[in-house]
């Protein structure tokens, strides 16, 4: 379920929307479509992680999470993964429970992988399909 967090205005509203979505049966909650700013931010994602954690403690049901929009670099993605591990634990470090909704991120991940192999960065155009 997409919450469009940029429209919710407060962390309390975000927490409530997350809880309502999970209680209504959502098996995955997503920050936004990525079209409305702000989209995924660290504080917004933490509020959602904490709501998921508390829901799991209460019900035993694992809910997935997808931060979308605004995550552009591999370094930013790593920060989200660390926060996920620290808040929800290893069980959520799987595509069944956590995914990035960030198309721009893919190019940076590819550039980082090429740099590891070739010791040189490539432009995003290097990865474009013909």
Feature map (PLM): residue ranges:
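Alpha/beta enzyme core
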Residues: 2-66, 72-100, 111-130
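Short, flexible loop segments at boundaries between secondary-structure elements
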Residues: 103-107
């Amino acid at each position: 379920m997409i919450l469009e967090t940029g429209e919710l205005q407060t962390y309390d509203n975000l927490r409530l929307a997350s809880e309502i979505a999970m209680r209504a049966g959502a098996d995955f909650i997503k920050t936004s479509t990525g079209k409305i700013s702000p989209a995924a931010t660290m504080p917004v994602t933490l509020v959602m992680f904490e709501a998921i954690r508390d829901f799991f403690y209460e019900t035993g049901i694992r809910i997935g999470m997808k931060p979308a929009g605004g995550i552009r670099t591999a370094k930013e993605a790593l920060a989200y993964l660390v926060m996920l591990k620290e808040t929800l634990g290893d069980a959520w470090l799987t595509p069944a429970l956590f995914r990035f909704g960030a198309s721009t991120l893919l190019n940076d991940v590819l550039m980082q992988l090429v740099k590891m192999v070739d010791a040189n960065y490539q432009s995003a155009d290097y990865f474009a399909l013909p």
